[in-house]
Amino acid sequence: MRTENTATLNLIWGALILEELARLGVQHVCMAPGSRSTPLTLAAAQQTKLQRHLHFDERGLGFMALGLAKASRAPVAIITTSGTAVANLYPAIVEAWLTHVPLIVLSGDRPPELLGCGANQAIVQPGIFANYATQVNLPTPDAHIAPQALLTTVDEAVANQTRPVHINCMYREPLYPSELSGVILDAESPYLKPLQTWLQLARPYTQYGKSKQLSSPSDDAIMRFVHGKGVIVVGTLTPEQDPQQLIALSQKIGWPLLTDAQSQLRQHPAAIGNIDQLLQHPKARNLLQEADRVLVFGGRLLSKRVIGYLAEQNWHSYWQVLPEQDRLDPSHNAKHIWHANAEQFAALNWYRSSSANWANTLITYNDELHNLFVRNIDQGEFGEAQVIRAIANTRPLEQQLFIGNSLPVRLYDMYAPVSCCTATTYTNRGASGIDGLLATACGIAAHEGKPTSLIIGDLSQLHDLNSLAIAKGLSSPLVIVILNNDGGNIFNLLPVPNEQVRSEYYRLSHGLEFGYAAAMFNLPYNQVDNLADFQDSYNEALDFQGASIIEVNVSQNQASDQIAALNLWVKQS
């Protein structure tokens, strides 16, 4: 076999990796500029099966990939150069690992002889993501290593993977070929001779069967489980699990459906969406305490009240349904975990409960809260909850929501309106950081071009200001709604010892507005301080083919004061 020169062989290895990833279901590749990753970059530039996305900031790049993977329900590749470029992906990789989102990091690296000797931009990259990624360390490209070995290495690491994989790619110089031929994977190349059949086909070199096994209870177990007073709690579910099937399940069994903000069912009229607030409603809480059976779909519940309810009840039977093997119960209840998605589990042979409709009064209490929120939020003072309810009520079938962490997602969970339907809803609630939220929303918006709304706090937006560059490149509607309450005002809800400490060390008031940031990236911008102006700006932004910013200015105490007042009313109901 003729020995390929270094630059050409580097490029062939890069092309083999990207071609195999495309065959394994990857649709998008996110790339940051850098020299050591040149073989991967040049291969990606000529790969026609992948959509390419570029950004200069690797932290934002990782979160954009996270959003693309969430929206496409497929793995996304990320290409970076060596050094701290790789380290900047860490927050996104952590979030992806915790929420089972498949990201594939392809990091360029120095060869072994340039590590630990003071060579430029060289750090120890294998294992950099610790327990948050499956690690694959490739040697420097070598003509004595069969190309089949490279393909089977990629296949074994990526096939059926639901979490991040880090493939570290060492390259020796020269990195740049003297010229780029039209076809990198040339069938005439002696090195590729063993892959002649693979080159003519479109399937992966190794085809793995699906490894997921559905676990489900027997008919007899189901009959015994539903014999009593029970509740169905729906936590975080992804849209592809078809959560709508849980409405029919709830009605068939005759148990109430208690829905989290991330359930895709929070606003459904047949669900008890106001469960967080109902748990401080005396009559509703007393009724819910009669339940002795619980069926939980998903995990990562947002409401501390719901988590507390699940922890405090003396459950006769506790079932949890998860699509992956996970431990998602901070209260450590004794339970039976079934491995299935929501749609599969709802399709089992369910029976009517012997105590069907035992909690129908919850519907009345839920409706009472709905009316309370209409009067005191929708028809009350302009504020954060009012804006969130207005967004949730606007064109839910036409758009998708990404709700930021800290206060926005909690306000949605507490006060989202009941409506005909719920927009497809995304969050980053694995590690629940405030970093990368705009970049994630950009990835979600970029996948299929569906109008997308991001609800984000001011500190979260400041944290991800660089990602306005990604937003600038979008050609589909992305409405960035910034709730600017001048600092981290979720700390108003927490028992910080005194107001001075809260202000100086937690809230971090900044006095900044976002108009100049919008101008810097040439994005349409509106600043509003009343509901009518917000609704006009919001509807206009949903029809704009690109990203735009609406800044909502409210006082530091508006949301916390309103929450306190509503809590008082609910407790006195």
Swiss-Prot record:
Pfam families: TPP_enzyme_C, TPP_enzyme_M_2, TPP_enzyme_N. Its cofactor is Mg(2+); Mn(2+); thiamine diphosphate. It is an enzyme of class 2 (transferase). InterPro entries: DHS-like_NAD/FAD-binding_dom, MenaQ_synth_MenD, MenD_middle, THDP-binding, Thiamin_PyroP_enz_TPP-bd_dom, TPP_enzyme_TPP-bd. Binds 1 thiamine pyrophosphate per subunit. This is 2-succinyl-5-enolpyruvyl-6-hydroxy-3-cyclohexene-1-carboxylate synthase. Catalyzes the thiamine diphosphate-dependent decarboxylation of 2-oxoglutarate and the subsequent addition of the resulting succinic semialdehyde-thiamine pyrophosphate anion to isochorismate to yield 2-succinyl-5-enolpyruvyl-6-hydroxy-3-cyclohexene-1-carboxylate (SEPHCHC). Pathway: Quinol/quinone metabolism; 1,4-dihydroxy-2-naphthoate biosynthesis; 1,4-dihydroxy-2-naphthoate from chorismate: step 2/7; Quinol/quinone metabolism; menaquinone biosynthesis. Coiled coil: none annotated. Its EC number is 2.2.1.9. Keywords: Magnesium, Manganese, Menaquinone biosynthesis, Metal-binding, Thiamine pyrophosphate, Transferase. SUPFAM superfamilies: DHS-like NAD/FAD-binding domain, Thiamin diphosphate-binding fold (THDP-binding). GO terms for molecular function: 2-succinyl-5-enolpyruvyl-6-hydroxy-3-cyclohexene-1-carboxylic-acid synthase activity; magnesium ion binding; manganese ion binding; thiamine pyrophosphate binding. Homodimer. Belongs to the TPP enzyme family. MenD subfamily. It catalyses: isochorismate + 2-oxoglutarate + H(+) = 5-enolpyruvoyl-6-hydroxy-2-succinyl-cyclohex-3-ene-1-carboxylate + CO2. Gene3D superfamilies: 3.40.50.970, TPP-binding domain. One of its GO terms (biological process) is menaquinone biosynthetic process.
